[in-house]
Curated annotation (Swiss-Prot):
Residues 1-8 are cytoplasmic. One of its GO terms (molecular function) is heme binding. It holds the Pfam family Cytochrom_C. Gene3D superfamilies: Cytochrome c-like domain. It is a single-pass type II membrane protein. The chain crosses the membrane at residues 9-29. The gene is cycM. Heme c binds at residues 84, 87-88, 150. One of its GO terms (cellular component) is plasma membrane. May be involved in electron transfer from bc1 complex to aa3. The keyword Cell membrane applies. It comes from Rickettsia conorii (strain ATCC VR-613 / Malish 7). Binds 1 heme c group covalently per subunit. This is Cytochrome c homolog. It is found in: Cell membrane.
Length: 175
């Protein structure tokens, strides 16, 4: 095959492509397709879940923590706190995992475990872990300490938070 024949073949392919493109443009001009967006399938109306309603109610209404603590259930708190054990240990002087151990956390100064590197957000808070601070932190860690390393979204139901706090107070000390 000579160079002239190869040039003819390439020119024919390019010319055919150009003709096909031009035919497409002309057809679009003549027929002016309507580009009305049509919805495919069906849409589902989503109602706000009760969990979201509880979260917004907790953020809007003041919560009486001492009253919740009177009705708290440590056994329910134990079940809810199983989520915590993925990142925390409950053993006395237990190993730090992704988070520090939670032995005797109630009443302990914040960011006080020496061999754990806390985020700057939590390190500069100061104070001790009392019912109020634990409640706020467990409800929404990112709101209580913006910039915290803790990626847990929080516990939405106030009674569940009180149950976990009671569990942390009683179960750990009895071990």
């Amino acid at each position: 095959m000579s160079g002239k024949e190869l040039n003819k073949i390439v020119a024919a392919i390019l010319f055919a492509s150009l003709i096909a493109m031009m035919v497409g443009f002309v057809a679009n001009i003549l027929y002016k397709p309507t580009l009305e967006l049509q919805h495919r399938g069906y849409s589902v109306a989503v109602q706000e879940s009760s969990e979201n309603q509880n979260t917004t109610a907790l953020e809007q209404a003041p919560v009486n923590i001492p009253e919740l603590m009177k009705t708290a259930n440590a056994d329910n708190g134990r079940e809810i706190a199983k989520k915590c054990l993925m990142c925390h240990s409950l053993d006395k002087d237990g190993p730090n995992k992704l988070g520090p151990h939670l032995w005797d956390v109630t009443g302990r100064p914040k960011a006080s475990i020496a061999d754990y590197k806390y985020s700057p957000a939590l390190s500069k808070l100061g104070g001790v872990w009392d019912d109020d601070s634990l409640f706020a932190f467990l409800h929404k860690p990112s709101s209580y300490a913006p910039g915290t390393k803790m990626s847990f979204a929080g516990i939405s139901k106030p009674q569940d938070i009180a149950d976990v706090i009671l569990f942390l107070k009683t179960y750990v000390h009895d071990k």
